[in-house]
C-alpha cells in the first residue's frame, strides 16, 4: 500500500474534522487511526500547513502528553472556551478529554471514525 501525500492529508483532515467540541486527540492517535502509527510527526506537519481558514478544529490536537502546540498562544483559549480545563503543568488530561476511548470502545476497528 502506497502512502500518497494527498490521501494521507485527506485522512488527517477527515479525522480532525470529527473531533467533537470539548474533546482532544493526539497526533499519534490520528496516525494510528489512519493505519500508520509511525507517522505522528507527519500528522503534525500536515496540520501545521492547514490554513486557518480551513475551518478544521486543529486546536483540538495535542501531543501524547496533552501538551499544546509551542508558540500557538490562541490554542489554550480555544480549548478553554470549549470547557477543557488544564492541569497545573499546562497539559490537557487525555483520560478526561481524549476522544479515543469513545471512538475505539470495545475493540472497534482502528479506522472506525473515518467517515468519507
Task: Pin down the residues of each PLM region.
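Nucleic acid-binding interface residues in structured DNA/RNA-binding domains
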Residues: 1-116
Amino acid at each position: 500500500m502506497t502512502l500518497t501525500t494527498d490521501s494521507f492529508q485527506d485522512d488527517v483532515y477527515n479525522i480532525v474534522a470529527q473531533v467533537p467540541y470539548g474533546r482532544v486527540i493526539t497526533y499519534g492517535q490520528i496516525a494510528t487511526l489512519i493505519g500508520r502509527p509511525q507517522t505522528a510527526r507527519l500528522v503534525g506537519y500536515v496540520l501545521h500547513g492547514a490554513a486557518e481558514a480551513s475551518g478544521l478544529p486543529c486546536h483540538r490536537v495535542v501531543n501524547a502528553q496533552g501538551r499544546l502546540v509551542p508558540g500557538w498562544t490562541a490554542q489554550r483559549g480555544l480549548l478553554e472556551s470549549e470547557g477543557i480545563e488544564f492541569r497545573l503543568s499546562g497539559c490537557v488530561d487525555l483520560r478526561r478529554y481524549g476522544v479515543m476511548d469513545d471512538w475505539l470502545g470495545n475493540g472497534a476497528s482502528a479506522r472506525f471514525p473515518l467517515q468519507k
